Design a protein with these regions (language model features):
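Short amphipathic alpha-helical segments
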Residues: 21-23, 45-49, 84-87, 109, ...
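Hydrophobic residues in well-ordered beta-strands that form the structural core
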Residues: 17, 57, 97, 122-124
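Beta-loop-alpha module in the N-terminal Rossmann-like domain of NAD(P)-dependent dehydrogenases
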Residues: 51-114
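N-terminal Rossmann-like dinucleotide-binding module
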Residues: 1-51
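Short helix-capping segments at alpha-helix termini
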Residues: 28-30, 91, 117-120
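A contiguous active-site-proximal alpha/beta segment in oxidoreductase catalytic domains
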Residues: 102-141
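Structural signature of beta-strand start/N-cap positions in the alpha/beta core
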Residues: 7, 32, 68-71, 94, ...
Length: 141
């Protein structure tokens, strides 16, 4: 039985995907980055070439519609998170969203309401806050 491979499409080619979360996607077992998107096509092309990613786009809908992409990572400015998340879910793709999930409560509600119409996985990146606490300061409250 073959394992299912998550074939990621990144929407956003900034610092987060270059140095923080992005590199991990290519190191995790059964995870592969197959496409990236930036509104600046030259930036997307360079990013893809430097990292051995086979496809690049300058239009989010084209990346979302790519049949090889089976999950979408959204690492854009927060003002576009809700739009890209809903576009991805409409295409039937699970979504992993950088924090914050959206910029308003209403946008968060729109994202959360969508999965009720279908079965979806929506996940937002959250820092492990316990790591930020000084050692020995956890009181159990």
């Amino acid at each position: 039985m073959s394992e299912r491979i998550i074939k990621w499409g990144f929407i956003g080619c900034g610092e987060v995907t270059k140095y923080k979360s992005g590199p991990a996607f290519q190191k995790i077992e059964n995870s592969e980055v197959v496409a990236v998107m930036s509104r600046n096509g030259d930036k997307a092309k360079t990013y893809a070439k430097e990292r051995g990613i086979p496809k690049w786009y300058d239009d989010a809908q084209e990346l979302i519609d790519d049949e090889e992409v089976n999950a979408v990572y959204i690492a854009t400015p927060p003002s576009s998170h809700a739009t890209y998340a809903i576009m991805s879910m409409k295409a039937g793709k699970p979504v992993y969203i950088e924090k914050p999930m959206a910029v308003t409560y209403e946008e968060c509600c729109r994202i959360n309401a969508f999965p009720k119409k279908r079965v979806f996985h929506v996940c937002c990146v959250l820092p492990p806050l316990f790591c930020l606490l000084p050692k020995g300061k956890v009181t159990g409250r």
